[in-house]
């Protein structure tokens, strides 16, 4: 993961703190999509530091990134009486939503949860077929509708079916939509409202899948979605060698939305709960002594 950032950082760690290093760090952070605020703060701290070794530089950057994630809302723990727990998955076209829904179902099933997968993407028959195949492979319950049907009604039926059949988790996959399409964005509000009618407090989690390769372009998408429905957290998809990593920290600092999961690869197992320490270990190369 993050080969771009790791390779550049390795070169940076071999330099003493100087004007050239600060300029290189500034360029790197901008290239890696950390944005103006974080980049300027990094450079300011580099200028103030007295010690010029690789470990100091790494520690300085690590502290800054940790600080950017401070004060984020934590996911309220669901009461043991709340069953099923409903997770609504939304995002733009091509962000890997349906595959992520399957990975999330696998994640919960590995933790002894019974999962109902609900496919509401009535605009794309292939999307519903894909979700059905995943559900069959995973042994999940499955509810879908007819092409062109009412997505909110399907969500309602899915939750009601899960309640009747005793499922502990419901994952609702929605159709991909661009953040600039007003009517499709309004549909999300309707789905959220109808979920609450099917089960009080639902949806308990609203996750947005974010294509990590989009970089800064993802920030405005997340902001618009968050304005329409309150996002509980983000699931970054396609986190591989081409992903730069900085967008996650920008969104956390600017929009106060936490990252909940990281998705990489095509396997159902390729979804991890976001762990900051593990993430930073993968983000940074091993520090060599100067």
Swiss-Prot record:
Keywords: Cell inner membrane, Cell membrane, Cytoplasm, GTP-binding, Hydrolase, Membrane, Nucleotide-binding, Receptor
Listed result of changing residue 48 to W: In strain: TW-183
GO molecular function annotation: ATP hydrolysis activity; GTP binding; GTPase activity; signal recognition particle binding
Record-listed E.C. numbers: 3.6.5.4
Catalytic class of the enzyme: hydrolase
Positions that bind GTP: 91-98, 173-177, 237-240
Gene3D superfamilies for this protein: P-loop containing nucleotide triphosphate hydrolases, Signal recognition particle SRP54, nucleotide-binding domain
The UniProt record lists the keyword rRNA-binding: no
Compartment(s) of residence: Cell inner membrane; Cytoplasm
Any GO BP: SRP-dependent cotranslational protein targeting to membrane
Family: Belongs to the GTP-binding SRP family. FtsY subfamily.
The name this protein goes by in its record: Signal recognition particle receptor FtsY
